[in-house]
From Swiss-Prot:
Subunit structure, interactors included: Component of the RNA polymerase II (Pol II) complex consisting of 12 subunits.
Entry function: DNA-dependent RNA polymerase catalyzes the transcription of DNA into RNA using the four ribonucleoside triphosphates as substrates. Component of RNA polymerase II which synthesizes mRNA precursors and many functional non-coding RNAs. Pol II is the central component of the basal RNA polymerase II transcription machinery. It is composed of mobile elements that move relative to each other. RPB11 is part of the core element with the central large cleft.
GO MF terms, alphabetically ordered: DNA binding; DNA-directed RNA polymerase activity; protein dimerization activity
Compartments, as annotated in UniProt: Nucleus
Record gene name: rpb11
Protein family per UniProt: Belongs to the archaeal Rpo11/eukaryotic RPB11/RPC19 RNA polymerase subunit family.
The keyword Nucleus is annotated on this UniProt entry: yes
PROSITE patterns per the UniProt record, alphabetical: RNA_POL_L_13KD
The protein's name in its UniProt record: DNA-directed RNA polymerase II subunit RPB11
InterPro entries with a match to the protein in the record: RBP11 (IPR037685), RBP11-like (IPR036603), RBP11-like_dimer (IPR009025), RNA_pol_Rpb11_13-16kDa_CS (IPR008193), Rpo11-like (IPR022905)
């Protein structure tokens, strides 16, 4: 068949997951490349970074739709490193996603209880 093997979409095959480089064109800027990730994580991370007042610029690009990686560019104020801001944004995203998961599971369980209650009345 004329398609890549499915394991190639998630297996790194010797590539580092994250590559971090300081940007020589701008002060206090960095370029981060994440392998085997797509717009989902890139958009969440860029938006989380933009909500931080220490961040002057945050944006990403996906070089090619068939290559599953993205390049994130971050520029911060002088007294803060881009690496620390990215780590803080990732931790904040994890916390936020955990809250969403807890809320979803609670609502799902309430929905299941209400469905079971309806089924019991008609049985």
């Amino acid at each position: 068949m004329n398609q890549p093997e499915r394991y190639e979409l998630i297996e790194l095959m010797g590539l580092p997951k994250v590559t971090y480089e300081l940007d020589s064109k701008s002060p206090n800027a960095a370029v981060v490349t994440l392998e085997k990730e797509d717009h989902t994580l890139a958009n969440m991370l860029a938006n989380q970074l933009l909500s931080d007042e220490r961040v002057l610029f945050a944006g990403y690009k996906v070089p090619h739709p068939l290559n599953h990686n993205f390049i994130l560019r971050v520029q911060t104020v002088e007294d803060c490193s881009p690496k620390q801001v990215i780590v803080d944004a990732a931790k904040s995203l994890i916390t936020h996603l955990e809250e969403i998961k807890v809320n979803f599971m609670r609502e799902w369980e309430l929905k299941m209880i209400s469905v079971e209650g309806v089924e019991m009345e008609f049985s």
